[in-house]
UniProtKB/Swiss-Prot annotation:
SUPFAM superfamilies: Protein kinase-like (PK-like) (SSF56112). This is Uncharacterized protein ORF72. The gene is ORF72. Residues 923-932 have a biased composition (Basic and acidic residues). Residues 348-371, 923-944 are annotated as: Disordered.
Amino acid sequence: MDGGMTVSDKGNWSFFGMASENKRPKWAAILSKAMGIQASFMTDQLRTAGPNPEGLISIHNSPDEALAVYSAHHTDGLNTCKICGHNVRDLKAHARQVHLGRLCKIENLAELGLAQTLRIDRDVEFAYIDGCYFWIGARAAPGLSRFFKPDATRCHRCPTVEWPDIENGESLEAVRLTGESPRLTDRARHLLAFHPGDFMASITTLISPKKSMNCEAIYSARGELQRFQLMWRGYGYKGERATAFPTKAVNEGFGTAVHEFLKMYDARTKALSVLPSDTKIYTVRFMEGEEPTTAVIPPGTHSVVPATTPAPEAPGKLNMSSPDLELIRRKGGKRVIEMVSGVAPSGSLVGAPSPSERVMKRKSERPLDDSSAVKRVSKKVTSVTDQECTAWESSIPGVSIERAPTIYTGKSAQTIAGVLTEGGVAPYPLIMDVDGERDLPIDLPNQIITGRVIESLGDLEGDIAARKEVIKKAVEALRVYSYRPLMQLSVIGIFFDEGWIYSVLEKPTGDLKTMSQTLRVLSTTGTFPWGGKSPAGTWKMAIVHHIFRDVVKLVALQNRLKVTPVFGKQDVYVWEHGLTIAPNSVEPRVDITGAQNLIISLLSQYTMFQHTTKLPIKPEVRATLSPDVLKLLDWPPRPPSSEVTEMAGRLGVMGDIGHPTIQFPLDFKIHMGSERVLRPDVLLIKPPKAAPSFYPSMEEVLRVLETPGPRSDESDEMVPASALISHATLAASQRGLVAAHASVGRAQAALSTRGGAFGATPSGEDATSALMKMIQELSNTSIPTSRSLLCELGLSSMRGPAVATPRPAEAPPSTSEGELFDVDAFLEKWTGPAPVEGTAPVPVEIPIVGDDIIRQSMALAGGECWELTETPSGNVVATGFTTPATPTIINPPSPHVFAVPMPPPANPGKRTKSVKRRIEAASKMEGGERDATGSSMDTVRGTGGLVTVKPQSLIRGDELGLMDKWVFEPALDTRTSSYLRGVHRTIVQRWLQNHGSMKPKMCRDPPTFAITDADVPILTTTPDATRRPICVDNNLPSTPMVFTWGDPNGSEPVPTEHRTSYELYRGDIQAAHQCNLYLGPSMEIYAYSPRVWIAQHTFDGANQIWGGFPPVIRYVYLNMMKIRPSKHIPYIYTVIEPHSVKGYKMNMYALITPMGHPVLTTGVAGYSKYLIKALVRTLHAVHSAGLKIGYMHPKNVWVKTDALGSDLQTYYIFDVVTQILENVFMPGSVGGRNAPVIPPEWTSKMTDNGPPLNLITEASDIFCLGRLLTVFCAQQDLTSEQVALIQLMCAAKPEERPCVTDLLVNFNVSPEEPFYPVDIGEMPVKITNTKKAERSNTAYVRFPVQGAQE
């Protein structure tokens, strides 16, 4: 061991500085030689290399001894390894895999010329640990696991690469200690081909025992081709091997294309680097002839396969010694690559050899005479035609991006449809992910996107002033939205289209709790969103202190931006880091009343905000407030700027707000001289990184565009030279991107060439569809990153919200192509520049984009990038695909290592059109059959069927139809739509949050309704009837529960007279006598999705009316039908169809659709009286139908006002359907465990299931209504008698409370007022309807038009 140490030190000194002046070894030469090392392992299995107590590699007598030393000195006693810092469950297994290894000797040191250079004796022992050779005595460090976590199944840089598991029968210990692990070898091979810099960094441990370095490989032309060949063979990939690398002569374009591809590939994978950004990187240039030899890997065996008899290639293993790439010459101005045909593929790649190949063979047998240093070609060389060369060139992998859909409707959808129909190209929508300091959880596919028209553009062609004005307005309008983290919107995009600007704004989703939910939890449990409990009574203050800085920031932002965000309680989120507001809209004025009322409503328990009238605050509450809070509450609606600035500065609230960077993509028209035209296709707003606060005026932002260039011509819009120079790198990478896209376009043409240049292509496959399928396949495994879209595309010079990317160090300045350079100087002085920071950011960053970048982006996806669907009313909806996710390297349709070819599409060449709805069985449970693809969902569900609902607007019938399609139809196979999965997840989450359990617990009160507590509740209809199970299916997207009654025997088919449109809409003609009752929580999804709950109950009597139907449900239904539609219960619409004497079929829709956001404007005079009348009238309607509500909640009050002073309309919905059915089946749903207000008579009797059914009475309903009115009604609007009556409604004893009739009299409520009948619209319910192409179970119901003719 000591000898090893001495040699180590000696070798080290000679390498790094002691060698004489004229014998300095060349860094790249040493590395390239080291890559060809062949080792032989010691036969003694017991001697083991591992760390000694000081952390240096030494030799132990047995693996157990090495393990004992490791455990004693290199772990923290728990789960953390001190050497590599990984936290692992089994430290012993970790040590065997990563930090212990076998001893070996380097056999071929003399042949490689390293023995003399490094002064290494052939008999020196090295340790082979973790895929690297270590000197004995070197510092223990991770080898390959610097780049792969020890148990990783994926490469750290290639999102789609998986490692094969260790083969069965191998023990981990045996594998790690023999150095023959296929896993390690695969990883080393993968590193060499795909990430050579990482590979070289791992073998520097051999050259220098003191340190390992981070390297970057720069190859010569030949080396690049060699590396590309290794990549083509798919080293380190799991699964089938790709086709053999073709043997051919290729024109110069191929070498260039390979070079561009590798450059692009390395740039993208570098962005995913796990190394810290300040790591120094050593550049290694490989000259011609110095590339890694083909026997490159630290192999398990030390025998070299002779080059003359190549072994047959096994799947996943490559015979590395075959001399595939023999020589590269220049001939007639072209670079010719000739690969020796000793490894010609079995058979021909293109079927039979073409005549041109036979001709070319003779030519290539003649020697190439343009270089005397080159040997003559002694074997036959296969070549191909130029046409096939072109095809071959286009089969180099391109870059693809995982895509998420954006929905356009209205005018923009029409435009996109028009462009697609005429030219097959469309404006490519780009969306930017905003990466703020305190991001909300963002889940793009699970959001509904609304397009809102902001400003008309007018004619932009010749009018530069108008164009600037438009941009100015667009930027002003959008600027407020790019501020994070207070006004929190997850995505911002702006899209110019034939004179309109569309912005895409999205609300936060995920696990955030709104203010109302937070307060509900706080008032009952005293638990804060950030954890920890508060003594009763002080939680309001704690919340106010928690969010006060954010409210000051809100006020400061309003003051600075001169806008007022309009938000309600449902737009306010309190979470552990403070306050988040997702405003509903923005008004161009300053009014901080809403921000003040936010605090006041917290302290005084007002339910809703107001934006124009300041809420009163009680004197005793004021007395407890700090001076800052009081100062903010006393400010006028437009506060003095100096005071706001002073408070904001003192509290430091603006520190994490920078300026949003606005990027104007320019067309750089090379053919037309230097004229640059600002085109209004895309305006990207980049979010500010958390940075010191600076806010240039709009004039400053636009001045960059107005700066005149070198020429004095005023009409020419020049940009400052500094801005262009600082983006030279950006332009270069943009051009590379355009080239990559162009190669994809060429692939399409190549497919029509004879036979194809790269093997048989599946018939009918075109480049676009293959790409799209591969993208879908790869998107499941991509790495999510938080960087913005343009940074993803390699434009790292834009300082986007991305992690600092280490730049490749440039070549050492003093070296030219062929000369040696001083290694000592290299190591001491040239440590590689720190990552380039870039010039100081200017407010406007202007990339020079290639002339056809938009068109090329579209070429990547072709027309299929857009899906056009049509709503029932004839409106077009265009679904575009944007690119906010990880780029994945994929290839055009050649059988390449990156993806397996997909089967051909069913209808090649056809554009997606609107698909008529097919009627299919929704699930096996309902007796339906799946279609040929195994999917039980219809063809347009999913992204194409998303609905855009504008806030404050009624839901139209066609939108209702769409919503029904993606939310409410049950389907077991939810895998076909990630959207449905998201919806289902949201519902189940809400349900669990309220009820704590998915198991429906049933009440036992009605004697004919016996329930067991078993996991599957059993429902009996009569005491002696068959017991039928209730199926609880958690996969259903619409609700967590489905109760099914089927025919007890299940054998009889449905009588013919019952095969109506109702059975057919499920495609379910075997459904005998079945009722599906969908119970569950209301849909309450953020963004602009409407809160809609549809109960679809279908049942069919057997041989008698209502036969075999549970009496309790019969009671509920019969009573429901008594409730008439009114102004306050908008519609509960029931259809009963008599089919024959034998049975009835009833479809029932309870459609509860609120008016946008619930807003209560309590400031309107007389409002309280109006509200009381509306609520009492509704309660009367429900009670006189013989039903009890059981629980009421403010969230169900929806008030629609068109403007102040106009007619008010309240839609008070007691969740009529859900509450009634829940109260019958599961009283546990009465507010769940977190109900803020329950009648006093329930408190001692509450069970997990809620109150006993007999306690849900008229008196308990009146108590809930009384508590509701005390929250909502302003006392100044009421007489003292009315106030006393409301207080009496909240009396503790039920018998003291007034009844509904008392309320009608005392509040002067007429029991029924004239009501305009509901406009049913066109009812698609036709009894004789046998057309299967239309939904026949949706009743489109619209609200009455206000002020309809009497």
